[in-house]
Curated annotation (Swiss-Prot):
Stored InterPro entries: Aa-tRNA-synt_II, aa-tRNA-synth_II, aa-tRNA-synth_II/BPL/LPL, Asn-tRNA-ligase, Asp/Asn-tRNA-synth_IIb, NA-bd_OB-fold, NA-bd_OB_tRNA
A GO biological-process term: asparaginyl-tRNA aminoacylation
E.C. code: 6.1.1.22
Subcellular location field: Cytoplasm
Keyword field: Aminoacyl-tRNA synthetase, ATP-binding, Cytoplasm, Ligase, Nucleotide-binding, Protein biosynthesis
Keyword Ligase (UniProt): yes
GO molecular function, one term: asparagine-tRNA ligase activity
GO annotations of cellular component type: cytoplasm
Protein name: Asparagine--tRNA ligase
Nucleotide-binding keyword on record: yes
Top EC category: ligase
Reactions catalysed according to its record: tRNA(Asn) + L-asparagine + ATP = L-asparaginyl-tRNA(Asn) + AMP + diphosphate + H(+)
Tree of life domain: Bacteria
Length: 466
């Protein structure tokens, strides 16, 4: 017996009149007065379910088929036939229906066929991939991640598995999750009364990583072009639609590169992955356009065909000041632009994706290369219409004396970063990279307004269920 994914049947990949078995779950069951039942079966391989037409002469029709409810798992064997109904080209003329798993109580099943709010679905995150919307998110997320890996592979980059446990704070923000095996009820103490981390598993303070960048720099300074793609963690007590405590980051790092090089890399990568998802996940994107955000497909197509605008931070601030717009957060040189400022630039002024460069040093991290003016660093943000910042990057400071001075200025002990400083001592090179928050990318592509709905099991303040 040939087992076939639903997508292969609906796409016409398999010949009409061929016999196949489809395995999946019941979306709906509809019974006609003529003694025929219509089962909508989905298996997650594509957005649409396949319709199985089940006659009442099957042995288990009355005892089982007529008792099937949303969520039951089945194996249905039958012939592929042309569908007379509108909506799909093919359906299954069933000759056998095997019930694999029943829903215990159809009346209390959390994923009954009525539509649920996104907020409710977060409470049943283990069941929400069974819905149209979260299933579509999962497929889009997969296609985006595979496109990212393809892009970097085709460009000659090596994928680096950066460590999740670290003693370094890349961002210098201090909002990190501590990793410890010490007994919280009986902490070892030094003579001064501080916690004695020498007694801990690693013999020092360790944390979950906020970024793979610093480790990526080490490998870029040997392999020339690398990227990391993995989970990162921020202990930031932010309950917003844009923040997660655990999220995924894409972080390329390139030796012998400057700010302009990675600005071009960011543009090329985004256009590549958006073109890929438009081609691979059209059915899912059409669903998002009809139910979530009508501009999803048009926005992605425009993004792929647009030339990115570029502007210096100083000029961007002047544009905001000259706009006459009364922003919620006042505009002045030196601010870290808020989402409303970023979206004004991308959506109303440039009407295109825009790369803002050369930010004030006081709002950026210690590792960003100091510009000749002594006031700004070679940093960039990519701002996308509809969401604002989607990528942040910089040229890294490759001069040891300047890096040391910057760390001291920001209260970081250079001795704690000796391994990082070694990269400047031994064959230093100009290098640059950026970070892309993967969940923000998925949110942008799907139109889902909250990053909690584009990661399988969101981790947020006061929430680590499942």
């Amino acid at each position: 017996m040939t087992y076939a994914p639903v997508k292969d049947v609906l796409s016409g990949k398999l010949a009409v009149d061929s016999e196949v078995t489809v395995r999946g779950w019941i979306r709906t069951r509809r019974d006609s007065k003529a003694g025929i039942s219509f089962l909508a079966i989905y298996d997650g391989s594509c957005f649409d379910p396949i319709q199985a037409v089940v006659p009442n002469n099957l042995n288990n029709y009355n005892d089982e088929v007529l008792k099937l409810t949303t969520g039951c798992s089945v194996e249905v064997t039958g012939k592929i036939v042309a569908s007379p109904a509108a909506g799909q080209a093919f359906e299954l003329a069933a000759t056998d229906v095997k019930v694999v798993g029943w829903v215990e109580d159809a009346d209390t099943y959390p994923m009954a066929k009525t539509r649920h709010s996104i907020e409710y679905l977060r409470e049943v995150a283990h069941l929400r991939p069974r819905t149209n919307v979260i299933g579509a998110v999962a497929r889009v997320r997969h296609s985006l991640s595979q496109a990212i890996h393809r892009f970097y592979h085709e460009q000659g980059y090596y994928w680096l598995s950066a460590p999740l446990i670290t003693a370094s704070d890349c961002e210098g923000a201090g909002e990190m999750f501590r990793v410890s095996t010490l007994d919280l009820a009986n902490l070892p103490r030094t003579e001064s009364g501080d916690v004695d981390f020498n007694e801990d598993f690693f013999g020092k303070e360790t944390f979950l990583t906020v970024s793979g960048q610093l480790n990526g720099e080490a490998y870029a300074c040997a392999l020339s072009k690398i990227y990391t793609f993995g989970p990162t963690f921020r202990a930031e007590n932010s309950n917003t639609s844009r923040h997660l405590a655990e999220f995924w980051m894409v972080e390329p790092e390139v030796a012998f590169a400057d700010l302009n090089d990675i600005a071009k890399l960011a543009e090329d990568m985004l256009k590549y992955v958006f073109a890929a998802v438009l081609e691979e996940r059209r059915d899912d994107l059409e669903f998002f356009a009809s139910r979530i955000d009508k501009d999803v497909i048009n926005r992605l197509e425009q993004f792929v065909s647009s030339d990115f605008a570029q502007v210096d931070y100083t000029d961007a601030i002047q544009i905001l000041l000259d706009s006459g717009r009364e922003f919620e957060f006042p505009v002045e040189w030196g601010i870290d632009m808020s989402s409303e400022h970023e979206r004004f630039l991308a959506e109303e002024h440039f009407k295109a994706p825009v790369i803002v460069k050369n930010y004030p040093k006081d709002i950026k991290a210690f590792y960003m290369r100091m510009n000749e003016d002594g006031k700004t660093v070679a940093a960039m943000d990519v701002l996308a219409p509809g969401i604002g910042e989607i990528i942040g990057g910089s040229q890294r400071e490759e001069r040891l004396d300047v890096l040391d001075a910057r760390m001291v200025e920001m209260g970081i002990d250079p001795e704690h970063m000796n391994w990082y400083r070694d990269l400047r001592r031994y064959g230093t090179v100009p290098h640059a990279g950026f970070g892309l928050g993967f969940e923000r990318l998925v949110s942008y592509v799907t139109g889902m307004g909250n990053v909690r709905d584009v990661i399988p099991f969101p981790r947020t303040p006061r929430n680590a269920n499942f």
